[in-house]
């Protein structure tokens, strides 16, 4: 039976892709972008992918645009992976790409958008989450001509950006879905782990102030911290129940992460959260908002009790905590629509214009 299901998926997923509008990729260049630090870039490139076509109502307002934002070290391409893609964008799914206009940007410093590894290295402007959200807004409004969003959602860092969209542009969207995030300053263990990642690179003599010829060993040390930052104890025990399997599991992840990351980019990506703090602005968020976290998320552990209290300040907010099951994946549960799709469906229903 399992083999049959596997074969069905192998043939069904490509067939489903043929039934959907082809993804479109592009770049939008913002001229003379001024960062929160006061630094400027003559040309800031933002890469993006779109699925579907925009549709307007009788007043000319867009009614089907959806913005989905990725996590730290990621890109918009991560939402084209099978579990997310077919779970949300496929025919008959909640965000069917034949019905919605889906926008998947690469944030500043990520993917194919402007980033330190393009050549500026540590001379790249010290961007923040505020800069990233402002640039996303410029892409959406000026680059793509979108004047309203049906839904703003994001995973991890993208979830944090979703909170920011809610108070920076409160009338711009119908609904908000932050996944795997908290609406408070990054402190405690979370900030300590980020500092460990940054220090592991910058304290390595091979980093050379960012002017290395090959990736410094400090990147590998940083990757160890990244891996355990997003770990899932239950699932990892199931996947690696012996010493040999555990070591092979770790070695594989270290190799994949180090081959995908750049040391300077990683420093910027994790430090961009340094002044993130939506807490003073939560009452400004007026669109219906469902904040979804999972009980096995080591980045946003529910025992802190933060969302239990802060969600009370969001006028139309609701906190959903997914219980630990055999299907949750710790912090990575944010990318499994099968776990939280029922709540997205409810959010879309109650926020219908």
PLM regions with names:
Residues 285, 291-293:
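Short beta-strand/loop motif that positions the catalytic acidic residue
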Residues 265-281:
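Active-site nucleophile elbow and catalytic-triad environment of alpha/beta-hydrolase enzymes
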Residues 172-256:
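Alpha/beta-hydrolase-fold enzymes
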Residues 298-306:
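Conserved alpha/beta-hydrolase "acid-adjacent" motif
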Residues 147-190:
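Conserved hydrolase catalytic core segment
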């Amino acid at each position: 039976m399992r083999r049959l299901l596997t074969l069905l998926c192998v043939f069904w997923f490509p067939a489903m892709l043929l039934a959907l509008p082809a993804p479109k990729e592009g770049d939008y260049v913002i001229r003379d972008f001024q960062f929160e630090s006061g630094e400027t870039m003559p040309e800031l490139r933002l890469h993006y992918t779109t699925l579907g076509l925009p549709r307007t109502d009788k007043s000319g307002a867009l009614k089907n645009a959806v913005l989905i934002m990725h996590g730290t070290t990621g890109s918009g391409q991560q939402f084209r992976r099978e579990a997310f893609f077919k779970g949300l964008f496929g025919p008959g799914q909640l965000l069917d790409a034949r019905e919605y206009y889906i926008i998947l940007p690469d944030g500043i410093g990520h993917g194919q958008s402007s980033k330190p590894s393009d050549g500026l290295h540590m001379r790249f402007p010290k961007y923040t989450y505020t800069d990233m959200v402002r640039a996303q807004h410029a892409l959406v409004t000026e680059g793509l001509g979108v004047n309203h969003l049906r839904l703003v959602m994001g995973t991890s860092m993208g979830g944090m950006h979703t909170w920011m969209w809610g108070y920076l542009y409160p009338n711009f969207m119908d609904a908000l879905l932050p996944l795997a995030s908290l609406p408070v300053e990054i402190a405690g263990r979370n900030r300590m782990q980020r500092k460990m990642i940054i220090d592991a690179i910058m304290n390595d003599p091979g980093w050379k102030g960012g002017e290395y010829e090959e990736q410094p060993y400090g990147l590998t040390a940083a990757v160890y911290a990244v891996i355990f930052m997003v770990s899932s104890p239950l699932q990892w025990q199931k996947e690696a129940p012996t010493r040999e399997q555990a070591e092979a599991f770790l070695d594989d992840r270290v190799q994949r992460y180090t081959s995908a990351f750049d040391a300077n980019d990683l420093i910027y990506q994790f430090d961009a959260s340094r002044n993130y703090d939506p807490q003073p602005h939560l009452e400004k968020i007026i669109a219906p908002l469902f904040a979804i976290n999972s009980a096995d998320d080591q980045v946003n552990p529910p025992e802190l009790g933060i969302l239990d209290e802060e969600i009370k300040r969001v006028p139309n907010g609701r906190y959903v905590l997914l219980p630990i099951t055999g299907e949750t994946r710790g912090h990575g549960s944010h990318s499994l629509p099968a776990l939280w799709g029922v709540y997205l469906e409810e959010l879309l229903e109650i926020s219908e214009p």
